[in-house]
Every structure is written in structure tokens, then in C-alpha cells.
Amino acid sequence: MLGGLLAICSAACFAFNNASVRRAVLTGSIVQGMAITVPIGVPLFFIAALVTGNLAAVMGFSPTALAALSAAGVMHFVWGRYCNYRATRAIGTNLVAPIQQFNLLVTLVLAIWLLGEYLTPLKILGIALILLGPTVTMQKAKAAPGERAVSDEKITPIDAEKPAAFQPKYAEGYIFSLLSATGYGLSPVLVRVGLENQGIGVSLAGGLVAYIAATAAFALVLLWPGQWKHVWETDREAAKWFTFSGFLVFFSQMFLYMAMSVAPVTVVSPINRLSILFRLFFSRLLNPQHEVFGGSVILATVVSLLGAVALSLSTDVVQSLLPLPESMVTLLNWRWP
């Protein structure tokens, strides 16, 4: 249950981050955003590990663990984030979200193949419900493409401007959505390998390693001519929201790494998908003038939360709470592979 709760906290923070990034890219570029949101994780995780007394754990990681955590950082914070930003800019969040569900399948397949984890009927039900929740929302939005429920609220002067008609670049958006799914799908498995079941505290040290590797990798991008000048020209409004996003990403990843250290990937990753639903609420709060809002949000939220509960509950807990017939007990105890 703890792993599931931490995964939900991670999903909420990640969704808030998405809404913040959406505001930032109204006046800032992808490179400018990554130049702020990637490096900011290093001092934040350093402080968290130092305060909790887990900084020394960095030196205790095996070479394999260091390699796995470093690879996770590059795949998630650099590759996945860049592709996600590109896809969102090309086709918008509503079209990106259902395509990125592919990363869940990548994670589950790799977890079963490499980590020896398994599926149970409860996990399969939970996965199905979590995938169904966002699908309900996306299908509803697709059914009424002409509707655009936009709030009259004005948060900044940018909101006073009527947004231009959005022309999706489908090829670019779909390609980068799938590419981001590979990064986001592979990184949880690498984190699980790197943490080696060492507990919540050590996960903070693992996050520090991942962010250092990601920052070093992204620093190579800034060596390209003109990139440093471009970053220093970041708009003040964009810099504010990118910085806020960086803090939200830190909390999101901190909760995620803690969840991965105490719960199976097959539980944490699907629950983390709830961020797709949370972002609709945060978008309404932060971006009333710059997002498209569909219906069926409450239904989708309830369906996905039921899936999260199914994933968090163990078979033993269900059997202790409900008087089940022998045939049902046998079904619940089924495992694959």
C-alpha cells in the first residue's frame, strides 16, 4: 500500500509539472526548459539525501547499480523529456497522452523479462482500468473536436490574448510520443535494477546519481554553437514557470524512486499513469485559456482510481477482507509467468 500511495503522490506532482511546463512553453523553448529543469534536480536531491543521512549511500552502489541509475537518468530526464516536449508542442497534450500509454507496456514486459516479476488477475484488472480511464477522456474529446471549453479567467497578460488556431503536426507528434514512451518505459526498470531493493532512503541517493548523469549528458547539448546564448535569453515569465516545474519534477521523481524501492514495477508504473487524469485538473487551474477540456473527467478518474486500488491490493489482503469461494481464491492466486 505504501508503494501505491507514493506512486499516486508522484503522479499528482508530475501532472502539476505538466501544467507548469505548458505555461512555460508559451514564451520559452524546449532547450531553455531542459536547461533549467534538468540541472535543478542535482542540488535538490543532494540536499534531500544529505538531510536524511543517505548521501553516503552513493558510494555504496555497485558498478551495475551506478550504470543502471545513470542510464535511467539519461533515458528519462533527457531522452524522454525532450521527446515529450517535442510531441506536446507538435500535437498537444490530449493527443500525446493516449499514445504514451505504450510506455506502460514497455515497462511491464521488461519487468517480467528482466526482474522476474509476475502478473496476477488483480494486477491485470488494475492495468486494464488504468488504461481505460484515460481512454474514456480521450475518446470523449475526440467525439467533439469542435468544442473548446475555455475559461474566462486571466492569470497573466498572456491569457488576455486569444490563442491562435492550433494546427497539429501529426507525423512529428506521433513519432516523438512513441520515442518518449521508450524512455519513460525503460527508466522504471533501470531504477528498480539500480536500487536493488535497498529501501526508501537509498532511493534518494539513487535519484541524485540519475540527475547527475542526466545533467552531464545534457551539458553536451549546450556545447553546440549558440545554445548557451539561447538559454541565457530565456524569457522571465518562462524562467519562472520552468523553475517551478523543476521543483515539481524533483518531488515527483523523489516519490517515484521511493515507490520503486518498496513496490514492484508492475504496481508503481501503472499507478503513475494517473498523472494523465490529474493534469486535466491542474490545466484547468493554471491554463484555462490555453488548453482544451473534454468531458467525462470524473468517470475517467473514478475508473483509474479503482485500477490503482486493484494494483495496490495484494491477493492476501483481498482474501482476508472478503469470504471468497475456493474457485475465486484459485483464480486470484494465478500468476504469470
Question: What feature does the model see in each segment?
Answer:
Residues M1-Q32, I36-A71, R81-I91, Q139-F176, ...:
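Membrane-interface interhelical linkers
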Residues S10, G41, Q100-N103, S180, ...:
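Structural signature of transmembrane alpha-helices in multi-pass secondary transporters
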Residues A15, F46, G73-V78, L104-V109, ...:
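Hydrophobic/small/kink-forming positions within alpha-helical transmembrane segments
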Residues I30-V31, T93, L119, I200-S203, ...:
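Membrane-helix interface/capping residues of multi-pass secondary transporters
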Residues G33-M34, V96, S203-G207, V268:
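Juxtamembrane helix-start motifs in multi-pass secondary transporters
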Residues T37-V38, Q100, K123, I127, ...:
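Residue-level recognition of transmembrane alpha-helices
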Residues P43-A48, V106-L110, L129-V136, A216-L220, ...:
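Transmembrane-helix signature of multi-pass solute transporters
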Residues L105-L125, T135-T137, A141, L277-L299:
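C-terminal transmembrane-helix exit sites in multi-pass transporters
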